[in-house]
UniProtKB/Swiss-Prot annotation:
Component of the entry fusion complex (EFC), which consists of 11 proteins. During cell infection, this complex mediates entry of the virion core into the host cytoplasm by a two-step mechanism consisting of lipid mixing of the viral and cellular membranes and subsequent pore formation. It is a single-pass type III membrane protein. GO terms for cellular component: membrane; viral envelope; virion membrane. Most cysteines are linked by disulfide bonds. They are created by the viral disulfide bond formation pathway, a poxvirus-specific redox pathway that operates on the cytoplasmic side of the MV membranes. Residues 1-30 are intravirion. Coiled coil: none annotated. One of its GO terms (biological process) is symbiont entry into host cell. It is found in: Virion membrane. The gene is OPG099. This is Entry-fusion complex protein OPG094. Induction: Expressed in the late phase of the viral replicative cycle. It comes from the Viruses. Keywords: Disulfide bond, Fusion of virus membrane with host cell membrane, Fusion of virus membrane with host membrane, Late protein, Membrane, Signal-anchor, Transmembrane, Transmembrane helix, Viral envelope protein, Viral penetration into host cytoplasm, Virion, Virus entry into host cell. Belongs to the orthopoxvirus OPG099 family.
């Protein structure tokens, strides 16, 4: 046999000598600040109304039923009457959905079943 020379491979590690300067934050502070500024502008443009609603004081909307809380119901014969409405000084007939007066046999008995012997306010009926 012929004499074959042996070749041995040794791993060689080469340490990189260049630096990644593009990844450095310190060199590009202005770019980062510009990006943050652009993000805030975009948030303002697209979410302006939501931000305004979040920071504005919420106005309390008055409940229209609050004006009816002092009104009371009473019976005149078999007719249901409302008195104490703020815009009407006299006793008025209670109206149904079709704008006809509410007439119910044993009207007083019905009102007693709602609130006993105490006067029945419109608020008592609306809460049920």
């Amino acid at each position: 046999m012929e004499n074959v020379p042996n070749v041995y491979f040794n791993p060689v590690f080469i340490e990189p000598t260049f630096k990644h300067s593009l990844l450095s934050v310190y060199k590009h502070r202005l770019i980062v600040l510009f990006e943050v500024f652009v993000v805030f502008i975009l948030i303002y443009v697209f979410f302006r109304s939501e931000l305004n609603m979040f920071f504005m004081h919420k106005r309390k909307i008055p409940d229209p039923i609050d004006r009816l809380r002092r009104a009371n119901l009473a019976c005149e014969d078999d007719k249901l009457m409302i008195y104490g409405l703020p815009w009407i000084t006299t006793q008025t007939s209670a109206l149904s959905i079709n704008s006809k007066p509410i007439v119910y046999k044993d009207c007083a008995k019905l009102l007693r079943s709602i609130n006993g012997s105490q006067p029945v306010s419109l608020n008592d009926v609306l809460r049920r």
